Amino acid sequence: MSKTVNFRATKNFYLQFVSVSSRDTSCIPCIHLFFDSKRYVFGSVGEGCQRAILSQQLRLSKIKDVFLMQGSSISSPDTYDSSSSSSTTSVSDMLQLDDRDKVIVSERNSMCSTVNYPTWWDSCGGFPGFLLSLNDISEPGETGEASPFVLHGPSEVHQFLSSMRHFTYHTNVNLTVQGYTSAEAPVFVDENICVTPVVVSLVKNSFKKRKHENINRGTNARPLKEDRANTSPHWYSHVSNDTSFVVENAMYNTPAPLEPDKPELFISYIVQSHPTPGKFDAAKAKSLGITKGLDCGRLARGEPVTLENGKTVYPKEVIGPSIPGSSFFIIHCPNELVIDLVIENHKWTNAPKPVCVIHSVTPEVYKNPRYQSWISSFPSEVSHLIASTEVNEVINYPRSAVAIATLNLLDSKVFPLGFNCYEVKNVQKNNRIAFAKPKLRFAFGKKTGIDDSEVGVSIEELKDKILKEKPDYKSFVEEAQKYVSDKPKAPSFAGSDIQICTLGTGSAMPSLYRNVSSTYVRIPVDKKCMEDSAISMKNILLDCGEGTLGRLSRQYGDNLKYEIASLRWIYISHMHADHHAGVIGVLKAWTKYSDGRSKLFITAPPQFEFWLLEYSRIDYLPLSNIVFISNSALRTDRKPSALESSRLSSLFKEFDLVSFRTVPAIHCPYSYCMEITNSSGWKIAYSGDTRPSEDFANIAKDSTLLIHEATLEDSMHEIAIKKQHSTYSEALEVAKKAGTKNVILTHFSQRYPKLPDIDISTEDLHIALAFDGMTLKISDISLFRYFGKPLAYLFNEENLKEESDPLKF
């Protein structure tokens, strides 16, 4: 049954770029459309999206519709089948494009590649966290109903939502789906806008109909129910176009795999606001005999009025012509193979003239003569906003960037700025064309046009500004640097040269200052033992929250290729999304940079295996290269199966381990604490999320390094018990019981960015407080105590209040 839509005539509204292609955000732009009554998102909800929305002080709860632009394909990367290209492309053109694609693929795998090519994960990789945050802040309506939210996009959105059921919920959000296919893409109309999807498709050759890969399992995981998945659409019966997404029979309603040759969709949009009614001509109405106010009202509402003399006055006689609404196009054309399909689509011809056109394109597409000719065909008064997939060196999270720059003054090695982070190019090319940046606006209405007044400035000048405005901080920094430089180098010990990089140090959801959980462990190895002498590390990720890949890219720049190629193990402590929602992005990068022969170990709860298997049915994952081991296989109170033992043996050999144990954490089901011990003598223990645990203290005994969550300050002990987390003092007490010498506290509550009230100057226990991007060797943790005064000054509440607009000068 159709519902009545009451149109709102709104002349003034604007769109704003939340993110563009960068090291830590999706290569598909995220565009926020603002009306008084509600907000919309077009483009992507990629990793880092909700943090960028928060950083720009936009209201997540006001967003009611998201329109995605990129479809999925289960084929391997870069295997486009040119036979599905436009019929107007000649055979020679196809061959040339195929060759060009080969060059592009080669460039993608080069160390200095700066161009991203969209995948399904780029489109919606941040949606799990987005949905959880939206659910937390949404409130029921007046009659108790859940807050409405519609996700528009390719039909595989259904499968994607179903695969997320192991770790997402939305009891406060009535989530519905509007799926598009190449044959059917209905127009969306609400009180503010009319949205027409423009869908084109391209077939990828899927390894020439590759078979569905199997993950190398080290568990007794229950297989997916293929019979139910393939015989009918019952697997998504709990996701429909007119009902909320409800989890039912979670272990069995599994996504049906996409057909091997299912076309990949590229969706553009025509967006138009509703026309403004013409003005009521009171003088003309009076001349026609209309004298009563009620009659004027009826005419204004479009109703005819019959006078006492029998004459009928019609609205068109007293109301001027309506003013057409404003229109804009969002073009998604990330591949040269679909240029003709996009630009020759009949819907552009039939659409109203746009005020502006947004181009989500690769550099190759933008420079293509055919595409340039199409841009030139628009009237000269039309503005063009170019959102290239080329990596932009922009600041997406200003307060975090300011904190990192300030910490960098204290110690540039422990708190590196990151590679190429802070270059900001000119936004506007000319009056007609502008390159999109975060916070760039385009206004419609009285002040139609580009507004770049809010676009952030370069942060390179920030260090001098900080030192000038915070003279006390400068003196604290100089004092700390003197202590560190005067201290003799600590003697080496087993594991002293292991490097720890705390990529994400906050809890629950991203914040202005901290991203969610991820700790990167870089273990040096003997180059002589390696086939590739350039790779001198074997790396581990301890948890992998949303945005982990982005932080790695910021941290290591063009060396990201080597870091990812050296990644051998991902450990997931439990199934909360803030600890694992970044794994798919890392796997995508690992596929791109690994040699194709390497194995990647993943130890995680069994539900995580289901997530990977089901997600791989809608998007490519390198499952044949993954060795999965359930965390429960390592429990001290049980013996692993023969298959688990075989997988564990390979893991032990890879890292030269003599011990790897887990114990149940005092947190959610299937959550674990762990320790690993190397044959050389070093030992690392990691708590994950937990209340203080005697069992963990026991397996962490005499560890070289203990990494422990410290979510809440000591005054919030009751909340810590309720939420099953640890306070600062409780975490340190576990470290003391374990007899460890070095401890890193992390996973701080996002409620407050201030520094924990902890004495870090102790000699017997070396304490480091984790910050995003902090990098230090285990042997350097003992120097962290000299940073106490400058850190306390930097993160006191008064200084934080002063940073209301940290990038403004």
Swiss-Prot record:
The keyword Secreted is assigned to this record: no
Classification via InterPro entries: RibonucZ/Hydroxyglut_hydro, RNZ2-like, tRNase_Z_dom
Annotated stretches, region: Disordered: 74-93
Protein name: Ribonuclease Z 1
Primary gene name: trz1
Disulfide topology: none
Key word Hydrolase present: yes
The EC number(s) this enzyme carries: 3.1.26.11
Reaction(s) catalysed by this chain's protein: Endonucleolytic cleavage of RNA, removing extra 3' nucleotides from tRNA precursor, generating 3' termini of tRNAs. A 3'-hydroxy group is left at the tRNA terminus and a 5'-phosphoryl group is left at the trailer molecule
An example Gene Ontology biological process: tRNA 3'-end processing
Any GO MF annotation of the entry: 3'-tRNA processing endoribonuclease activity
Alphabetical UniProt keywords: Cytoplasm, Endonuclease, Hydrolase, Metal-binding, Nuclease, Nucleus, tRNA processing, Zinc
Record's subcellular location: Nucleus; Cytoplasm
GO cellular component: cytoplasm; nucleus
Named cofactor requirement(s): Zn(2+)
Protein's organism: Schizosaccharomyces pombe (strain 972 / ATCC 24843) (Fission yeast)
Task of the protein: Zinc phosphodiesterase, which displays some tRNA 3'-processing endonuclease activity. May be involved in tRNA maturation, by removing a 3'-trailer from precursor tRNA.
Protein family: Belongs to the RNase Z family.
